[in-house]
């Protein structure tokens, strides 16, 4: 059989030929399920279609869905690499019917594909059905001709699927392939069903019921949801029992072998497989907008990346490896998933940065491990809690801890480690809040179902008329909002923009006969329901009330300028920094804009200046900003920039601005539902304020436009003029004059420090004779006040040089009354005196605790600087003891 890419295509083509709509994979970050960390099944994007909340223009669909299982309930991470079929990333092939065909057609379509299109031998196939699903049982006999011996009734929940405690549910029917009696294992439902002989290749779910509290009802329009793992069916069709022996996985593993020079079929086979699998998860997650971090989805990605990087080290890789594998993955899967082609530069940069950091983590972890295990001897057990701390806090893998200790005959307490891990997983499950609509937003589902979408008029006007369709207060629908009340209003149509895409919602006024209300904010719920947050100032707002609607013009104009400037800055950043720049978040407000983007390091002053100059070049050209409605696929194909993880409908708005002087094409082209200026000149000016880091690999640019930028520049100019007047120079000379003053101050500080040092060395300051002998040891004691703490060690070093052999102690009393103490011991006395012990004696007199450093130089301090002389005397006594 052909390769994985051809198998994927043949599945989709088969169902398209049979009347199904080919639907693109949804992102790995779920759009519509707040409980799910990652998309882990094909039906996830259709959840609201099955429940009736969402309508699609088709009743049959086919998909190849990218999935990740590496966190929460569905977690295959620890098994990956050590079995033939576990993955963190996989593709789920599926066909779906939304109230169209049911069991008979689903079974017929499945059977014809695997036996006629793919030529699987019928005598090696068997099916399971739910124990009381006689209809499915009879259909397998009728459609497939399976004998009773190869149709197995299963009484457990394995063959009954439910979306949750309530909602659509129904029996399943699974198709199994028999690999032959030379492989251990029994058929499904038998005591040894977990063997590898009988492998499930396809699961057909018959959604025919709706589960309600206490009862189960028949659905009026039963549906079909199927799932087939592409990796598993590809292995079968390519004549192997191992998913990692398919052509796609072999290509990645071959590249790992080439780069490490370690055979992929030898003792370290598992490491090759871990790297191949985790590379796919890492690149696809980055392409869908997830970046490594210490929480949520980013933390799971970091664990996946670092597990692969650990195995790269086990293969002997001395330099970062993972980023060098991205091209082979893009070559193998980029045609099916063009998002990884667009994200190739970002994924490469992210993997390189993460692996560089991880190598430092490993070095630090080994040092900490050595410290924690210093007192253990062969046969001892290393505390599991400490191993977990190394793993959780420092990212130090357990297997590395075990490897490092095994050579010393020390074993890790796995049970304690596992217990700590379980506690963390329980906390993570309890704390996971996810994304999407919150539970308190359920009221909007009812409003959406009854009233439909809100018609948005705001692209063309800032005033309109509308009628109240729903009123909501404290999460519940109400019939009216009296004067003084605050609540949410849904209208049949509105010019008010609802907060989305980083752009803040509009505010303004609504009024009708005897009623007025301020619109404080506007939000979008469920994608197309515009919700106006209002405070009624006069009269009573009721269902059906006709209203005049007026957006705050000045505020909207400022927002428009900032949104268009954001597009110009986005493209300018790509031109200056490279194609790896991708939007990671934004805020478009009336008074400022904020743009988060992928980039591994701070921008230089020159790069910031270039970005600002490019943006302002297009502002000054005052070219038209064009908006077109296009099919989403056509828009992306034409070069419009789509944001990773963003949900787009079948038709999208494409906003283009500026003309590229090189080729005449638009400078910036993005899919965007926001409001924009008519011409780039309406932006006025773009002023970049700052570049800062917000997360690993993510930078933030802050900027102003129009009136806000003008005010900022005026304030800066005024400050410059004032400073020039104070310094009695021209504005052009301010920078040089300030630099000279700063250097002059530094010189004065150096001179002052030198003077204090000379004063201290000149005669011991307030403590009398500079050098005394204590039991044959020379002791130089110096008490000073007001010195810079940074200078104390230099004074001690000079004192050690002066006395040649002995102990030097310097006590400083600061302006706030606190005391600082530094003690030094010359090299010849290192075995006799310990500076750390001596400084602790003096620090105790100052009212402090401890003190740290080295045996030859240590420091500490305390709140009572008035006892500096007493502290020096205490050290003298210790020398004489």
Swiss-Prot record:
Entry GO MF terms: alanine-tRNA ligase activity; aminoacyl-tRNA deacylase activity; ATP binding; tRNA binding; zinc ion binding
Domain of life where this protein originates: Bacteria
GO cellular component: cytosol
One record GO biological process: negative regulation of DNA-templated transcription
PROSITE patterns: AA_TRNA_LIGASE_II_ALA
Primary localisation category: cytoplasm
InterPro entries: aa-tRNA-synth_II/BPL/LPL, Ala-tRNA-lgiase_IIc, Ala-tRNA-ligase_IIc_anticod-bd, Ala-tRNA-synth_IIc_core, Ala-tRNA-synth_IIc_N, Ala-tRNA_ligase, Ala_tRNA_ligase_euk/bac, DHHA1_dom
Record's catalysed reaction(s): tRNA(Ala) + L-alanine + ATP = L-alanyl-tRNA(Ala) + AMP + diphosphate
Residues reported in the UniProt entry to bind Zn(2+): 563, 567, 672, 676
Keyword Transport appears in the UniProt entry: no
Protein's job: Catalyzes the attachment of alanine to tRNA(Ala) in a two-step reaction: alanine is first activated by ATP to form Ala-AMP and then transferred to the acceptor end of tRNA(Ala). Also edits incorrectly charged Ser-tRNA(Ala) and Gly-tRNA(Ala) via its editing domain.
Domain remark in the UniProt entry: Consists of three domains; the N-terminal catalytic domain, the editing domain and the C-terminal C-Ala domain. The editing domain removes incorrectly charged amino acids, while the C-Ala domain, along with tRNA(Ala), serves as a bridge to cooperatively bring together the editing and aminoacylation centers thus stimulating deacylation of misacylated tRNAs.
Name of the protein in its database record: Alanine--tRNA ligase
The organism of origin for this protein: Azorhizobium caulinodans (strain ATCC 43989 / DSM 5975 / JCM 20966 / LMG 6465 / NBRC 14845 / NCIMB 13405 / ORS 571)
Gene name, Swiss-Prot/TrEMBL: alaS
